[in-house]
């Protein structure tokens, strides 16, 4: 995996044929051209036996997207033991199973549509908890790191460079990019990174894939 993505632990895979398709169009001068566009598909996320949400996604890293979404919605806790993750590509469903029994029927009734180009959804009282989040005052962020990161990230082969119309988020350590995720919604890309980070702690079994 490290070799495939160069300096990244995980990164974009623009040559994956399932993520883009070729279309015929016209450029700004009216000339007929063939170009690539990103494919968008639904993914339904279950937590144990309960259907939580269907999100629109580019389709890579569905297991990390599901785990990260549930974590960022406060449906998964940091100390939860994830027993298994099952992904069925035929029906575009991910099932995350935990040792703890869960029931979010009441929380799912309270839905907030967030603003932005890709209107997202948050459940329950999540918006009220944002005020409690703070960054440690000892955190250091250097502008030289940002310039270096910008150069590295912008030159990385990606779906954005191949097809455009997609968002990207990158997990970094100082001036080194580690995990680069892309998706049709920036919140999806962030959820994938969160899912990756949680998987380092709590997921011992690999995702079971069908289809």
Q: Where is each model-derived feature located?
A:
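Short, flexible, glycine/charge-rich loop motifs used to bind or transfer phosphoryl groups or to couple energy/partner
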Residues: 159, 198-199
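A short alpha-helix capping/helix-coil boundary motif
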Residues: 172, 199-200
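A short, polar/charged loop-to-alpha-helix boundary motif
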Residues: 187-198
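Alpha-helix N-cap/helix-start and coil->helix boundary motif
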Residues: 62, 186-187, 210
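Intrinsically disordered, low-complexity regions enriched in acidic/Ser/Thr/Pro/Gln residues
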Residues: 2-174, 179-180
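Single conserved hydrophobic/aromatic residue that forms the stacking wall/gate
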Residues: 201-211
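Positively charged, proline/Ser/Thr-rich regional signature most characteristic
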Residues: 177, 182-189
């Amino acid at each position: 995996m490290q070799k495939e993505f160069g300096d990244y632990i995980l990164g974009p895979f623009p040559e994956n044929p399932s993520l883009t398709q070729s279309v015929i169009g016209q450029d700004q001068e009216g000339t007929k051209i063939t170009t690539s566009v990103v494919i968008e598909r639904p993914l339904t996320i279950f937590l144990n036996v309960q259907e939580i949400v269907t999100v629109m996604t580019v389709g890579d890293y569905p297991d990390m997207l599901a785990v990260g979404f549930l974590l960022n919605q406060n449906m998964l806790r940091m100390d939860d033991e994830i027993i298994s993750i099952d992904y069925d590509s035929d029906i575009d469903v991910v099932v995350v199973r935990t040792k703890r029994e869960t029931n979010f029927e009441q929380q799912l009734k309270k839905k907030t549509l967030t603003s932005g180009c890709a209107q997202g959804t948050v459940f329950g009282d999540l918006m009220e908890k944002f005020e409690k989040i703070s960054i440690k005052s000892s955190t250091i962020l250097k502008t030289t790191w940002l310039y270096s990161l910008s150069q590295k990230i912008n030159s990385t082969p990606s779906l954005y460079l191949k097809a455009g119309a997609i968002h990207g988020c990158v997990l970094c350590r100082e001036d080194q990019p580690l995990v680069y995720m892309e998706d049709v919604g920036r919140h999806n890309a962030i959820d994938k990174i969160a899912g990756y980070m949680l998987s380092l702690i709590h997921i011992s079994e690999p995702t079971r894939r069908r289809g």
